[in-house]
Amino acid sequence: MTLLAWCVAWILDVVIGDPPHWPHPVRWIGRLIAVSQRVVRRICHSDRALRIGGGVMWLVVIGLTWGVAWGVLALAHGIHPWLGWLVEVWMIFTALAGRCLAQSAMAVARPLQAGDLAESRHKLSWIVGRDTSQLQPAQINRAVVETVAENTVDGIIAPLFFLLLGGAPLAMAYKAVNTLDSMVGYKHEKYRAIGMVSARLDDVANFLPARLSWLLLSLAAVLCREDGARALRTGWRDRYQHSSPNCAWPEATVAGALGIRLGGPNDYFGQRVEKPWIGDAVRDIAVDDISRTIRLMWVASSLALALFIGVRYWLVGAA
């Protein structure tokens, strides 16, 4: 039943994703983080105090998320096994973000294909932290491909990985780790101290999933009739071409698969950030590379699901 729950949750993510008005745990986690951050800032004033407070905030958010998820699941199973199974499916479904990611990427690609640069920039600003107001089509394409590649780890592979390690409650706890990083894990002066623990522990949580993405995306490239060998080579060669210890693994692999160049300088919070280039410009990046990256994401996602189901079946059987 557990493995069936995994498959049903994954299919639900593929088919319906995250309808905007449905209740979603990540929104609740986000509200908890916002309240916790206000409390920490009210109490802590020096950088040292903010770092400590940020660490306490991390423990509170992760602990509450895991505890509530475990408690709700245990209560549902206690009422009826089928209710417990349905709650498990719902938790796993909400931990995955494949369709949401694909829809967000195509929301940028469609106006770009129609020549509406302003609308494309606007939609891009919803999913990236960089300044999008002056971006040209090639830069927009690059930003979307990078976002889809990076979030293949955050939104699919890592949740499935933690689902394997500790079931739905640990997958939900991972979503809290990721949400903390997305809300406070910035190098900007406002967040550097309070978000230090969140940023570093997000790096720790994604360490193995990011490296798995190198293999999964390379195999996906073969299955999608992209250049799998170049994906494997470039992913390994450029794995450190990023300030994050994890982001370059999926980005470089996708860049190699498609024969394009990612990375480079960008503006964040009004500051110019120089980043190294990733991949080789075998050809110019194009808007079609967005849909090709989404295809790689879906195939890598299905491979990750199959891999983790296989590992769990080998360890404990079909239970």
From Swiss-Prot:
Transit peptide keyword on record: no
Source superkingdom: Bacteria
A single GO BP: cobalamin biosynthetic process
Metabolic or biological pathway, per its Swiss-Prot or TrEMBL entry: Cofactor biosynthesis; adenosylcobalamin biosynthesis
Localisation: Cell membrane
Keywords linked to the UniProt accession: Cell membrane, Cobalamin biosynthesis, Membrane, Transmembrane, Transmembrane helix
Pfam family, one: CobD_Cbib
Transferase as UniProt keyword: no
MF GO annotations: ABC-type vitamin B12 transporter activity; threonine-phosphate decarboxylase activity
Topology class, membrane: Multi-pass membrane protein
Primary localization: membrane
GO cellular component, one term: plasma membrane
TM segment ranges: 56-76, 78-98, 153-173, 204-224, 296-316
UniProt function note: Converts cobyric acid to cobinamide by the addition of aminopropanol on the F carboxylic group.
Family, similarity comment: Belongs to the CobD/CbiB family.
HAMAP family, per database record: CobD_CbiB (MF_00024)
The protein's name in its UniProt record: Cobalamin biosynthesis protein CobD
Classification lineage: Bacteria, Pseudomonadati, Pseudomonadota, Gammaproteobacteria, Enterobacterales
